[in-house]
Amino acid sequence: MARIAGVNIPNNKQIEIALTYIYGIGRTRARTVLSAADIACDMRVKDISEPELERIRSEVAKFLVEGDLRREVTMNIKRLMDLGCYRGIRHRRGLPVHGQRTKTNARTRKGPAKSITR
């Protein structure tokens, strides 16, 4: 197994798919990284040489991935909550942030339904 950005990449998958195991890299960014490193997208990880892996590592290092990206997202949400803006309040209350309805649905975000006893 190759190791890129602290993540073990599966050997028997195509490199384009294998790169998506890294948090912050999807299919489009994987293609961008591979084209910049001059590597074919349909190669298997086990067929890639060490110099090619180094080129991929250097390209991936240019992006914010894994722990740094998670920290950045967490800090952005925390900043919104500290500002007290609408989105921050919605995050704080555990409600949907992007304008979805909450009279019905939104159970994933709000948690299990609380029964009202009379």
Curated annotation (Swiss-Prot):
Subunit structure of this chain's protein: Part of the 30S ribosomal subunit. Forms a loose heterodimer with protein S19. Forms two bridges to the 50S subunit in the 70S ribosome.
Family listed: Belongs to the universal ribosomal protein uS13 family.
Molecular function per GO: rRNA binding; structural constituent of ribosome; tRNA binding
Name by which UniProt lists this protein: Small ribosomal subunit protein uS13
SUPFAM superfamilies the record matches: S13-like H2TH domain (SSF46946)
Entry-linked PANTHER family: 30S RIBOSOMAL PROTEIN S13/40S RIBOSOMAL PROTEIN S18 (PTHR10871), SMALL RIBOSOMAL SUBUNIT PROTEIN US13M (PTHR10871:SF1)
HAMAP family, A to Z: Ribosomal_uS13
InterPro entries: Rbsml_uS13_C (IPR027437), Ribosomal_uS13 (IPR001892), Ribosomal_uS13-like_H2TH (IPR010979), Ribosomal_uS13_bac-type (IPR019980), Ribosomal_uS13_CS (IPR018269)
UniProt record, GO biological process: translation
Region (Disordered): 94-118
Cleaved signal peptide residues: none
Entry GO CC: cytosol; small ribosomal subunit
Function as written in the Swiss-Prot or TrEMBL entry: Located at the top of the head of the 30S subunit, it contacts several helices of the 16S rRNA. In the 70S ribosome it contacts the 23S rRNA (bridge B1a) and protein L5 of the 50S subunit (bridge B1b), connecting the 2 subunits; these bridges are implicated in subunit movement. Contacts the tRNAs in the A and P-sites.
Keywords linked to the UniProt accession: Ribonucleoprotein, Ribosomal protein, RNA-binding, rRNA-binding, tRNA-binding
